[in-house]
UniProtKB/Swiss-Prot annotation:
It comes from Rattus norvegicus (Rat). Gene3D superfamilies: Histone, subunit A. The gene is Taf9. Pfam families: TFIID-31kDa. GO terms for molecular function: ATPase binding; C2H2 zinc finger domain binding; DNA binding; DNA-binding transcription factor binding; p53 binding; protein heterodimerization activity; transcription cis-regulatory region binding; transcription coactivator activity. InterPro entries: Histone-fold, TFIID-31, TFIID_subunit_9. Residues 151-174 have a biased composition (Polar residues). SUPFAM superfamilies: Histone-fold. PANTHER family: TAF9 RNA POLYMERASE II, TATA BOX-BINDING PROTEIN (TBP)-ASSOCIATED FACTOR (PTHR48068), TRANSCRIPTION INITIATION FACTOR TFIID SUBUNIT 9 (PTHR48068:SF3). This is Transcription initiation factor TFIID subunit 9.
Amino acid sequence: MESGKMASPKSMPKDAQMMAQILKDMGITEYEPRVINQMLEFAFRYVTTILDDAKIYSSHAKKPTVDADDVRLAIQCRADQSFTSPPPRDFLLDIARQRNQTPLPLIKPYSGPRLPPDRYCLTAPNYRLKSLQKKAPTPAGRITVPRLSVGSVSSRPSTPTLGTPTPQAMSVSTKVGTPMSLTGQRFTVQMPASQSPAVKASIPATPAVQNVLINPSLIGSKNILITTNMVSQNTANESANALKRKREEEDDDDDDDDDDYDNL
């Protein structure tokens, strides 16, 4: 520590000499050399803040200049904000006595650190795991069949219509393509029956194929081509021939009835 006389030579600025004199008047004779610089910086910052606040108060009061009342108000507000005095000792003792009268929670006798419950400790987890949302099951009366797309060939299911079921010809052909891994998967192709205008209800029809199950393990790395035809040409020709024969039989029966009527 250096004395104040050694820290304030004649070469010091006037502000530094004044700060050294203030310290000497307060009975501070020993201090470090940089204490004067810190005190000067604090005084400059404090005075600048007070004058800025006084200018704001003066403009708010619509005064042409800053007067002493504005400076006093700024000093009072700054003192209440920055230089708050601690509460008295007796007041702190009363608060501490009331706080200590509250009993601490009981510690459960178990192995581990002897700490109060988690809600009284800062070590309790402050997060909660989010539960996974389960998807709603599909209703039993409604089955959604996705669009089948294997390679470059696709088959889109259509909505089934009410009517007389008609036979459908289905051909499944395979062609070599890019290898695919289809192990453990199973595809369902739904082909609903539709009514054909060329066939009447009096002709018995073969039940149509509704579902075709394809096991990829039997196919391997091949593409699947599924094509459906409404009614084959042979079935249409047979139906037309049956109708023609029925009409001829009806015409023959009519001719026989006419001959019998003439004979009578």
